């Protein structure tokens, strides 16, 4: 993987990630394909929304169907028939989400398989081996996602273990002679001094890109913005920056303003299945009765298949009838909305007009523009 930085506007960056499998224009949003599929969508449909890279979930794919099944096909790209780049998370976040079902030790994490109850062990080395078999274009190190709230002492010990695991991830990745990219993950909770130690430690180890982890886990938005403003300038300028698990459209805008290049989140797909649809001026809850006789498109500014062909009344009808097509059409729209937002941000950065774009964006959804600290 190669990262090219074209231009900047304030802290925002316009560039691209270059892989053997294709080019990803940045800032970029990655749809989430947890089980090797973006729910309800074919790879061709996902591509038509404008997505150039997907996220796959190491933890879930390892437990089901397993590495060996995917290796029968080649790798994850061949298994799911997505021929563009794929980033896979390390499995750390899912393991730590298991709560009482897992035990964290220096060597790794022991836990019960949530599918069948079997005892399972996942370590930095094992995560690197799984992601190697998946053929991931971007491999994520195995880390502990520090929960929120966490006091300083816990956040410190968690961050320090993540740094040790980062070194072990790097070593096993290199032993496998993996020619793809490996990203480090910056931890430290909401504590700037701990984030400083994490960034320095990861940069000293050396990675192809750097993710900001442990945000969007319940902390106030002000804390997320503060940590991004503190951390991003410390990441080498020639490396991509990835904000994990984020987020709402305004979170993408705020991340870009602070120097983030890559995002992923289940929100556009999950919300689509629940009838919450993102439009230029906010959110449409298509389940509401007021849409039952509305012949207008979901979003007059949107060029997606759904908005070109169907009315709000039809989408309301499908949702109320719990029709599968409704979830599919909603997902097509939400993913296209996110990709249109990213394209708008990229164009605004190119033209040096990002803050005008931001003001217009917030004006349309009726919210004030969050301040940028110097």
From Swiss-Prot:
One of its GO terms (cellular component) is cytosol. One of its GO terms (molecular function) is tRNA-guanosine(34) queuine transglycosylase activity. Substrate binds at residues 89-93, 143, 187, 214. Pfam families: TGT. Its EC number is 2.4.2.29. The keyword Glycosyltransferase applies. Keywords: Glycosyltransferase, Metal-binding, Queuosine biosynthesis, Transferase, tRNA processing, Zinc. Zn(2+) binds at residues 302, 304, 307, 333. It catalyses: 7-aminomethyl-7-carbaguanine + guanosine(34) in tRNA = 7-aminomethyl-7-carbaguanosine(34) in tRNA + guanine. Residues 245-251, 269-273 are annotated as: RNA binding. The active site is at residues 89, 264. Its cofactor is Zn(2+). Binds 1 zinc ion per subunit. Pathway: tRNA modification; tRNA-queuosine biosynthesis. One of its GO terms (biological process) is queuosine biosynthetic process. InterPro entries: ArchSynthase1/Queuine_TRR, TGT, TGT-like_sf, tRNA_ribo_trans-like. Homodimer. Within each dimer, one monomer is responsible for RNA recognition and catalysis, while the other monomer binds to the replacement base PreQ1. Belongs to the queuine tRNA-ribosyltransferase family. Catalyzes the base-exchange of a guanine (G) residue with the queuine precursor 7-aminomethyl-7-deazaguanine (PreQ1) at position 34 (anticodon wobble position) in tRNAs with GU(N) anticodons (tRNA-Asp, -Asn, -His and -Tyr). Catalysis occurs through a double-displacement mechanism. The nucleophile active site attacks the C1' of nucleotide 34 to detach the guanine base from the RNA, forming a covalent enzyme-RNA intermediate. The proton acceptor active site deprotonates the incoming PreQ1, allowing a nucleophilic attack on the C1' of the ribose to form the product. This is Queuine tRNA-ribosyltransferase.
